[in-house]
């Protein structure tokens, strides 16, 4: 009787859309296959241009505001680290979860969610725009790495399990669905990735990435708000302030009641690490207290999910569709409270809203400029795609792909040039 332990991931999970030939540039006598398939996937994401562009894309405040702003790139690195830590506790492949964290925002356009809103308006005639669907499009076609037998790009040619791990919303756009994971143009690779998967259910690795994302941006947005003196954590201990936040949260998060949010605010305000921050004054002691707070909260939220999932699923490696991630409702409520703090004191600031309106106008202007002058106004890869497009919708999709690929600096230079201030894109 064999005692060999079964591999958690099989050949089906490691399959790529295009079979790749061995590398040919190695020196004689060297071993070129020392990495796992998922380690190669992680490296491909880490080295791709789309990831580097996130350094000049907004997380909450602009990437050039202050000395140490969080950008989409630094946020993605933090999500990858939190996800990797959770994967250790759950038995998922570490490279698989880490690459999901690295790639989870890789499709974000300039100005983050605000840019998503503008591009969704631009793309109304060709299926809309959604950052998660753009993630998938970048990884499966737009990012140049591997061609199929017809000379068409298959993007980074990641394994099935890797692409599935990045897919938070495994369905196309529908009438009642605000979030979706695939454009209609990308259904063929989507069907390949989701072959045999339970309908509308993300794999465990994607669920881990999703929770790591929630934890990262809820905790770190509050940290940035405290540093910028926009958020004072003492409001959590003030009954009237907490009640107002809970009322706002109830309207924003349908799954959590105002009473649950009030209780969550009370639990958070009672934590010694929260009380230690007090009125932040940027001294050494205050900076240490704030960093201790973020570390403790990330650990609190991640470890709660690990423990609850283990209690439900048992020991051993948990991978793919063997389990779902379980997060205690009280922990979800605490994370929601942190999100509400950022919403109330950062995102709802009138100056922030005015800036966002100007950003959306800029995206609309540049879209009109690119479409009117295409293919001349497009980068060579996008110009070729524009020429090959069969209808106006497909051509607009190419323009949207081009804008989504821009850094904020490049978008602003192009817009400034067309407005006539002498700068060039």
UniProtKB/Swiss-Prot annotation:
Provide the alphabetized UniProt keywords: Hydrolase
Region named Disordered: 1-35
Identify the InterPro entries for this entry: dGTPase (IPR006261), dGTPase-like (IPR050135), dNTPase_2 (IPR023023), HD/PDEase_dom (IPR003607), HD_domain (IPR006674), PHydrolase_assoc_dom (IPR026875)
Similarity-based family: Belongs to the dGTPase family. Type 2 subfamily.
Looking at the record, the residues that make up the HD domain are: 72-218
Taxonomy of origin reads: Bacteria, Bacillati, Actinomycetota, Actinomycetes, Mycobacteriales
Species in which this protein is naturally found: Mycobacterium ulcerans (strain Agy99)
> Which NCBIfam families did the record assign?
dGTP_triPase, PRK03007.1
Q: Which residue windows are coiled coil?
A: none
Name it: Deoxyguanosinetriphosphate triphosphohydrolase-like protein
Task: Please provide, alphabetically and separated by semicolons, the GO molecular function terms listed in this UniProt record.
Answer: dGTPase activity
The biased composition feature labelled Basic and acidic residues covers 11-20
């Amino acid at each position: 009787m064999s005692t060999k332990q079964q591999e958690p991931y099989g050949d089906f999970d490691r399959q790529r859309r295009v079979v790749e030939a061995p590398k040919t540039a190695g020196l004689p006598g060297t071993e070129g296959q020392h990495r796992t398939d998922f380690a190669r996937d992680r490296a491909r994401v880490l080295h791709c241009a789309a990831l580097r562009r996130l350094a000049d894309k907004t997380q909450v405040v602009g990437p050039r505001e202050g000395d140490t702003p969080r950008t989409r790139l630094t946020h993605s690195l933090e999500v990858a680290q939190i996800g990797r830590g959770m994967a250790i506790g759950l038995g998922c492949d570490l490279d698989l979860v880490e690459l999901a964290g690295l790639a989870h925002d890789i499709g974000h356009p300039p100005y983050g969610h605000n840019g998503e809103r503008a591009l969704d308006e631009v793309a109304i005639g060709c299926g809309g725009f959604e950052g998660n669907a753009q993630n998938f499009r970048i990884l499966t076609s737009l990012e140049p790495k591997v061609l199929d037998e017809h000379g068409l790009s298959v993007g980074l040619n990641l394994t099935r399990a890797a692409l599935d791990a990045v897919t938070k919303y495994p369905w196309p756009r529908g009438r009642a669905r605000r979030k979706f994971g695939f454009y209609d143009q990308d259904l063929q690779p989507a069907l390949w990735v989701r072959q045999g998967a339970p309908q509308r259910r993300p794999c465990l690795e994607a669920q881990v990435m999703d929770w790591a994302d929630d934890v990262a941006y809820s905790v770190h947005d509050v940290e940035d708000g405290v540093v910028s003196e926009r958020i004072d954590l003492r409001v959590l201990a003030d009954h009237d302030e907490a009640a107002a936040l809970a009322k706002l949260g109830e309207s924003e998060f349908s799954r959590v009641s105002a009473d649950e949010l009030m209780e969550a605010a009370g639990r958070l305000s009672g934590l010694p690490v929260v009380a230690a921050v007090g009125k932040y004054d940027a001294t050494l002691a205050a900076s240490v207290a704030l960093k201790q707070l973020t570390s403790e909260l990330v650990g609190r939220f991640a470890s709660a999910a690990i423990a609850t999932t283990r209690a439900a699923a048992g020991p051993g490696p948990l991978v793919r569709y063997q389990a779902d991630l379980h997060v205690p409702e009280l922990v979800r409520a605490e994370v929601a409270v942190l999100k509400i703090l950022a919403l109330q004191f950062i995102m709802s600031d009138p100056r922030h809203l005015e800036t966002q309106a100007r950003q959306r106008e800029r995206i609309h202007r540049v879209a009109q400029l690119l479409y009117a002058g295409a293919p001349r106004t497009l980068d060579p890869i996008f110009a070729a795609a524009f020429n090959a497009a069969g209808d106006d919708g497909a051509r607009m999709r190419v323009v949207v792909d081009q804008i989504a690929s821009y850094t904020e600096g490049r978008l602003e230079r192009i817009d400034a040039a067309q407005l006539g201030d002498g700068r060039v894109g």
